[in-house]
């Protein structure tokens, strides 16, 4: 088969549960997947090791790690050492301190540039508006606006090669995401979700992300393979 017939996609891969599921979905849809991860100064750097491993084991065509210093900007518990990672439970009525200013816009822009170079029309990202309703850059209207911008601001878009921002998880609960991944053979023991995982990827068990992950497995009726430092 000629390369022109290959469906290519850029998949944002953090190394976490959601993005690993998105990669499996894209592959199940027949895309040749090119994964992209970001070393942006985050606390939980173990996710980068997980992302490389997931990409390799899944058979992704290529994997890239983009480096940027969002730690120098700060403003988030994930990038600013002066802001503690919350461990008291998920706040539903406010934007949480784990929101990283403009992160998805920055990440999608790198993915968009790569997609243009690869002549890929599709970008997959694991944003979710159900469990993380407080994140402004996880909302459907944000994705729609970004896709519109992508088609206005790129050579591909101007020449009629419409760019698509694919968000297959956006309306799913964490339990539904896990159930989908299990059906597709995702090995969740290889993923890292914790906001403050240690260098080996061991999860704290008490941050918002760990709480959502544990609850998701419980609601899905699936055994959680994660090793948690705390049973809270």
UniProtKB/Swiss-Prot annotation:
Keywords, in A-Z order: ATP-binding, Ligase, Metal-binding, Nucleotide-binding, Queuosine biosynthesis, Zinc
Binding sites annotated in the UniProt record for Zn(2+): 194, 204, 207, 210
CDD domains documented for this protein: QueC-like
Ligase is among the record's keywords: yes
EC class (word): ligase
Essential cofactor(s): Zn(2+)
Function of the molecule: Catalyzes the ATP-dependent conversion of 7-carboxy-7-deazaguanine (CDG) to 7-cyano-7-deazaguanine (preQ(0)).
Record protein name field: 7-cyano-7-deazaguanine synthase
């Amino acid at each position: 088969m000629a390369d022109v017939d290959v469906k290519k996609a850029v998949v944002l891969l953090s190394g976490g549960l959601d993005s690993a599921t998105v990669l499996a979905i894209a592959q199940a849809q027949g895309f040749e997947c090119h994964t992209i991860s970001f070393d942006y100064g985050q606390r939980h750097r173990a996710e980068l090791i997980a992302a490389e491993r997931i990409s390799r084991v899944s058979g992704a065509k290529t994997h890239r790690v983009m480096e940027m210093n969002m730690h120098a900007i700060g403003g988030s518990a994930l990038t600013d050492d002066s802001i503690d990672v919350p461990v008291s439970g998920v706040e539903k009525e406010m934007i949480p301190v784990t929101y990283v200013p403009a992160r998805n816009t920055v990440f999608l822009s790198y993915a968009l540039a790569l997609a243009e170079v690869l002549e890929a029309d599709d970008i997959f990202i694991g944003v979710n508006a159900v469990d993380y309703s407080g994140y402004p850059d996880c909302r459907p209207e944000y994705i729609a606006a970004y896709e519109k911008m992508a088609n206005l601001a790129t050579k591909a878009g101007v020449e009629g090669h419409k760019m698509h921002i694919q968000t297959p998880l956006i309306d799913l609960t964490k339990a539904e995401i896990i159930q989908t991944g299990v059906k597709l053979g995702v090995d969740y023991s290889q993923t890292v979700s914790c906001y403050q995982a240690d260098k080996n990827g061991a999860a704290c068990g008490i941050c918002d992300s760990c709480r959502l992950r544990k609850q998701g497995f419980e609601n899905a009726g699936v055994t959680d393979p994660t090793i948690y430092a705390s049973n809270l």
